[in-house]
Amino acid sequence: MGKLNIYEEASRCLLCQDAPCTKACKTGDPARAIRAIRFDNHKPALRWVKECSDADLEHAQQACIHYNWPIRIKEILRSIHPDDVDDSHYPDLTITFCGIRCENPFFLASSAVCTNYEMVANAFDAGWAGVFYKTICLQEIKEVSPRFDAMHNNATHGDFYGFRNMEQLSENTVEMDFDILRRLKQNYPTKVVVASIMGQKEEEWVMLAKMAEEAGCDAVELNFSCPQMKHKGMGSDVGQSPELVKAYTACVKRSVKIPVISKMTPNITHITEPAAACVEAGADAISAINTIKSVTMAPDAEVTGRRTVSGYSGRAVRPIALRHILELVKMPEKTELSGIGGIETWRDALEFIQLGCNNVQVCTAVMQYGYRIIDDLILGLQRYMVKRSVSELSQLVGERVPLFMNPDGLDRDSIIYPKVDRERCVGCGRCYVSCMDGGHQAIDFNTDTRQPRIVGTKCVGCHLCRLVCPTGAIIPTKRIAKK
């Protein structure tokens, strides 16, 4: 089984709670090993099954409750080579954000994943470094049902690439929420507790910020970006006005001594305009992005026959979030950044860090897979640092920013031709179809041998064929000068 198929098969795993496969295996934890592969840590996966015999893994496979057919646990794990990274010298992931020590860069984003004491405490116990607690306001919050829907992958119903929500802010009383934050900070003094707040006028912003400071919070986040607020003058409507966000940031900065973080909306043409206004008003950091306004005709998005605009998140929004982060990091008004948007694996988080974020916030992936994903977020980032011989996480912050330039600065005098790997090719012809109908008609397809052939004189190196190939049989060659 090749590497591609290892991931493909592991992606079928249901990621069960109290996994039957592990209960059936007396010598290891195959469920944890499969989860490591699922979240982009395939090489260290063997550490959880190093004592397992073939018979143990066969018992685990027989116990699998997948609704189609059992995950091929033994075949997956026996296909993995031993880890090439020494796990006895993993670096710690300590980093500072707004002058606050964070034990790692991974925070819960203000959302449904952190709405009460027990949830946040469980996340802290699991290894999350901090929380941007669900946004607190003075208005009464009433939610709709249902309020979530998703864009599913075809293969697995429970796995989705895009997620939509109509949820607003905390339904708790203000007093209840700040008591929760006070207890969290008292009981978890090494964790970072950030109060996310939202007001309708200056007096409300000031009042809530002072309550956050009095509760012992490490910082306060000003939510200028929720896209589905029922109340006027709140959420992303405010975030689109540089004048308003500047005024609200300034009044909070005058009122408290703890760091102030302004949260930006992506539902705007130039995110740098309100962000710069916040920095000018004294904001200590910018967090971005919140969810993207969206609509769908899916049945799950309907409430008694009616629909509304709601917020879109998940893996699909990550490239959009990264683009906003790039714009923010290039602002003349320099500030620290907290990255949000589509983070699911350690590689996703690394992209935000390399574009200038000192920490990252996660929501949708936690809603899908639980707080336990922190294990692989930490493990993957540590292994990456070892392989790069990087001793401190701060060395990675912003290191990829210089790679980005305007389109006119890119090399247009060279080309990378694709090549067909005959061993992997199954002759489906998908590359031919896409190149004929969406490319440059640079692939011939022999219907007798079912073999595609790339025509070099027509190929422009767009790589559409490589992207649509379901078996990974089309690979890039070396870059050469155009003829």
Where do the language-model regions lie?
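N-terminal capping/small domains of soluble enzymes
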Residues: 83-193, 199-203
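Iron-sulfur cluster-binding cysteine motifs and their immediate structural context
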Residues: 15-39, 55-79, 352, 430-448, ...
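Immediate flanking context of iron-sulfur cluster ligation sites
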Residues: 2-19, 42-63, 415-419, 423, ...
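Alpha/beta enzyme core
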Residues: 121-126, 200-338, 344-351, 355-359, ...
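Alpha/beta catalytic cores of nucleotide-metabolism and tRNA/nucleoside-modifying enzymes
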Residues: 1-3, 76-90, 313-327, 332-334, ...
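C-terminal helical cap(s) of enzyme catalytic domains, especially alpha/beta-barrels
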Residues: 143-156, 297-311, 365-390
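Iron-sulfur-cluster electron-transfer modules
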Residues: 34-107, 111-114, 128-129
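Short, charged low-complexity linear segments at domain edges
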Residues: 1-9, 27-50, 396-417, 430-451
